[in-house]
A protein has these predicted regions:
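Conserved Helicase C-terminal RecA-like lobe
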Residues: 11, 128-261, 265, 323-331
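Conserved helix/coil segment N-terminal to the catalytic DExD/H
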Residues: 1-14
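A short beta-strand element within the Helicase C-terminal
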Residues: 64, 259-271, 294-297
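Phosphate- and divalent-cation-binding pockets in alpha/beta enzyme and binding domains
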Residues: 3-6, 58-64, 148, 221-225, ...
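A conserved SF2-helicase RecA2
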Residues: 273-282, 286-331
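Conserved P-loop NTPase motor "coupling/switch" region that bridges the ATPase
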Residues: 14, 31-125, 290
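Walker B catalytic acidic pair
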Residues: 18-19
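Catalytic P-loop NTPase motifs of RecA-like helicase/translocase cores
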Residues: 4, 22-27, 56-57, 275, ...
Length: 331
């Protein structure tokens, strides 16, 4: 999608857009959605949209996926806000002392309106019979890591000899805790560091001899993996497919458009707040010939990851409200 501007100046008869849910941002259309709309308008092409998860977090995500279509189900609406007046239960949400409109409660009639335009297949109907097994494995982090997290929760600041960890807002506290539960931290200065290699070492020992794909969240987690695995780890899909033992991919960038069919298992160093990331990334090994997928989640004992997991498996993003509720029960 980011390379649409490089397409040759051809009057296409048909455009097929894969992973169409990537255009579903709202209330404002994303650059991806606007560029796609311009392409359709220019070429007057027919369009086929493909997605395994068209509305992973909200039915409201449907509008900008189809707003490029001049005869689509919602073409009568000038913009998302007009669409929302008829199709969304708009609520007010308090954030930072301000009230903002929340458009996530799209009504089920959105899907009903889409039905005449939609062909739906389950994986089984499409010939995929894979059984996915997920296992959560907990590790005990270093005592100093838990000490830092407890102090940060209590004081909202941890001062070292050279660096400071500051969590002066609820959002920053959530992100810092998320980082620390996998043994990394980004300091107030902007510098980052691995302070605990426990997860990386556990993965190396537990999956020794297996070809695995590892999903990580933060950049320093990749640094930890490189330090522990050395030359056995690659970030190149071509190298992995050619016989590589371990591939590491960032969750968001690796959740779509790639196949890890050569992997024996998927291992998650960390977990993303996004339900889309959960449902998309864990399906990267699936092929028609494969009968079983093994997926492993590596969580810190007493950490935030299990609470995130509970949310995203129910197709809900993990939010600040979840974190405020869960904070007192951590470690």
């Amino acid at each position: 999608y980011e390379s649409m501007h490089k397409l040759p100046d051809v009057k296409w008869d048909l455009i097929i857009a894969d992973e169409a849910h990537g255009m579903g941002a709202f209330p404002k259309p994303s650059k991806r959605a606007k560029d796609f709309r311009a392409l359709v308008s220019k070429t007057k092409a027919r369009v086929i949209l493909l997605s395994g998860t068209p509305t992973p977090e909200s039915y409201s995500q449907m509008y900008h996926q189809v707003y490029a279509l001049p005869s689509g189900p919602f073409h009568k609406y000038k913009n998302f806000y007009g669409f929302a007046n008829d199709n969304v239960d708009v609520k007010l949400k308090r954030i930072g002392g301000h009230s903002i409109k929340d458009y996530t409660a799209g009504q089920s009639k959105i899907l009903a309106d889409m039905a005449p335009y939609t062909i739906s297949y389950t994986q089984e109907e499409a010939g995929f019979v894979v059984e996915t097994t997920e296992k959560v494995l907990e590790v005990e982090l270093l005592p100093v890591t838990y000490e830092i997290m407890r102090k940060l929760r209590k004081d909202l600041v941890v001062e070292g000899k050279e660096e400071v960890i500051l969590a002066d807002t609820a959002v920053k506290l959530m992100i810092k805790m998320h980082q620390l539960c996998s043994g990394t931290i980004k300091f107030e200065s902007g510098n980052s560091k691995v302070i605990d290699y426990t997860k990386a070492q556990f993965i190396k020992e537990t999956f020794k001899g297996k070809r695995i794909g590892i999903f990580y969240k933060f950049k320093q987690e990749l640094h930890a993996l490189k330090s522990v695995f050395g030359d056995a780890l690659t970030e190149s899909l071509d190298e992995f497919n050619a016989g590589g033992q371990v591939i590491a991919l960032q969750i968001v960038s690796g959740r779509e458009g790639i196949s890890l069919q050569k992997a024996e298992a998927l291992v998650y160093y960390n977990i993303d707040f996004s339900a889309t990331s959960y449902w998309q990334s864990k399906d990267r090994m699936t092929t028609k010939d494969r009968l079983k997928n093994d997926v492993y989640w590596i969580f810190a004992k007493g950490g935030i990851e299990r609470d995130i997991y509970k949310a995203v498996t129910k197709k809900k993003d993990y939010t600040l409200n979840h974190f405020k509720r869960d904070l007192l029960n951590l470690f």
